[in-house]
């Protein structure tokens, strides 16, 4: 089910971006060559909210949780930019023997490189209405309020699951990558749609994964992007 949701999100983002690129190709007189105009670096801030899905052993809807993100960065060339993002809110998962659902909170910080895919394919043009960006980066996350899992262990003395249970506040490394679609509304304002996959160490969800693998969190977010100095 999750694969279908992710594929649908990606197809929507890629489809809208493809229409934009096709339109630019169909009207070469409107297309700006990547070296034809002076480029000015641009700072921006983004505020987004939406839903997160934690990869786990329950139905898709059971593992949905709220998510939010705030970021700031700079577009420093026609193709590349960089940003610092703070994201997170809540993550959910399930333990099956005995069966119970649990949640915890986290905040992730990451430094990311952003590639303007539309400009790479169709040439840079100032004021483009629709653009697709690819981003990737890494940083650290802090988990806290892991109350449900600790309560389950405390209330069941014979329960020996959740082998990687943590208490209090815990720090993790974190990485993520994804796609971002910008729909320009005004000179300094855009609607931003973002889908990303985040990776964490195996103890992020307090339990042992298959082959001590990684824990995954997927986000679908929507919000506003403000360009500064335009």
Predicted regions and their residues:
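Gram-negative (and chloroplast) outer-membrane scaffold detector with strong preference
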Residues: 78-157, 226
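Short loop/turn motifs that connect adjacent beta-strands in outer-membrane beta-barrel proteins
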Residues: 31-42, 79, 118-132, 185-188, ...
């Amino acid at each position: 089910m999750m694969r279908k949701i992710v594929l649908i999100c990606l197809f929507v983002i890629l489809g809208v971006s493809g229409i934009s690129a096709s339109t630019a190709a169909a009207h070469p007189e409107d297309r700006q060559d990547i070296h034809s105009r002076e480029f000015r670096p641009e700072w921006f801030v983004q505020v987004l909210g939406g839903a997160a899905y934690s990869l786990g052993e329950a139905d898709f809807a059971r593992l949905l949780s709220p998510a939010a993100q705030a970021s700031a960065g700079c577009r420093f060339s026609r193709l590349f930019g960089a940003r610092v993002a703070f994201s997170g809110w809540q993550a959910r998962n399930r333990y099956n023997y005995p069966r119970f659902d649990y949640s915890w909170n986290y905040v992730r910080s990451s430094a990311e490189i952003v590639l303007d895919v539309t400009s790479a394919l169709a040439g840079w043009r100032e004021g483009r209405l629709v653009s697709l960006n690819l981003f990737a980066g890494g940083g650290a996350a802090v988990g806290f309020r892991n109350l449900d899992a600790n309560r389950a262990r405390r209330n069941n003395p014979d329960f020996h699951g959740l082998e990687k249970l943590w208490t209090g506040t815990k720090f993790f490394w974190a990485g993520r990558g994804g796609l971002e679609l910008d729909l320009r509304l005004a000179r300094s304002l855009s609607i931003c749609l973002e889908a990303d996959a985040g990776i964490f160490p195996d103890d992020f969800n307090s339990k042992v994964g298959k082959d001590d693998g990684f824990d995954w969190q997927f986000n679908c977010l929507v919000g506003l992007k403000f360009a500064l100095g335009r």
